[in-house]
A protein has these predicted regions:
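Beta/alpha (TIM)-barrel catalytic core signal, keyed to glycine-rich beta->alpha loops juxtaposed to Asp/Glu
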Residues: 1-264
């Protein structure tokens, strides 16, 4: 969308109403260290030779930039979080932990699944717990922490919770006791496996953001180089001529405190 054409349309609409000035005053667009088209790509103005920020300054349009910390370097690369990623917890031997989970899941298929009625629709009871296989398949595809959190929160957790609750409701007697004893052994082992994958995903994200900081630091004042990557990314945007406001979603106290530092 051409900003200059939008301004022309606003002026035409105002003139059609007998008004001297239009009410088009604010533009919002994504911008971050990777997606800087508003600053560097001439695609609007006279002969399409001006950038969005240049036209915005000339026309008196306020520019709000969003996604300052969630970059999409390419269409296929997914989201790159421009923030530091502290490594939490101890490393997990994935192969060994996967074998432990696989053994428990095989025990479920032999001892518990046969007691469950198969409706013939949807997933068979024997396939309710196959995370050792699924996580082994998914592991090489994990791009980073943001990607892993999507997998964990949207695919793994909903399925596991739904199945756990359903079996706890429907099994009774000896079968229920057997299920509960197995569940109490299985859940901690599955969580350990998930924690190991989370750490691996964090390490992948950290490798990417470390390279970003290394490229960015020589361009920053020395006093800024010791700050977090998220602060550096926000400072760059907030200091860019033509950017009126940087919109940053802050879902925790730590996010707020980190972001407030750039206002000092």
């Amino acid at each position: 969308t051409s900003l200059s054409r939008m301004c022309d349309a606003a002026r035409a609409a105002a003139a059609a109403q007998g008004m001297d000035r239009h009410h088009f005053a604010v533009l919002q667009c994504p911008m971050n260290l990777y997606e800087a088209g508003a600053l560097v790509t001439p695609n609007t103005g006279v002969d399409q030779q001006e950038t969005v920020l240049e036209v915005a300054q000339r026309e008196g349009i306020a520019v709000l930039v969003n996604r300052p910390l969630n970059a999409m370097p390419t269409n296929k690369s997914g989201v790159l979080r421009l923030a530091d990623f502290p490594i939490e917890g101890d490393p997990v031997d994935f192969d060994q932990q996967c074998r432990t989970v696989a053994a428990l899941e095989e025990e479920y298929r032999k001892a518990i699944a046969p007691a469950l009625q198969d409706s013939g629709e949807g997933m068979a009871p024997a396939d309710f717990f196959t995370w050792a296989v699924e996580l082994t398949r998914v592991r090489p595809q994990i791009q980073g922490l943001e990607h892993w959190e999507q997998i964990e929160h949207q695919m793994i957790a909903p399925h596991v919770n739904q199945v756990m609750q359903a079996l706890s409701r429907h099994l009774t007697g000896t079968a229920a006791e057997q299920w509960e004893a197995w569940r109490d052994r299985y859940v901690p082992q599955l969580l350990t496996l998930l924690r190991g994958l989370r750490r691996e995903a964090t390490e992948r994200s950290r490798a990417k953001t470390t390279s970003v900081s290394a490229a960015l630091d020589p361009l920053l004042p020395e006093a800024r180089r010791r700050e977090s990557l998220s602060r550096k990314a926000l400072w760059v945007l907030a200091s860019t001529p033509g950017v009126t406001c940087v919109l940053n979603g802050m879902r925790s106290r730590d996010y707020v405190e980190d972001s407030l530092a750039i206002m000092g």
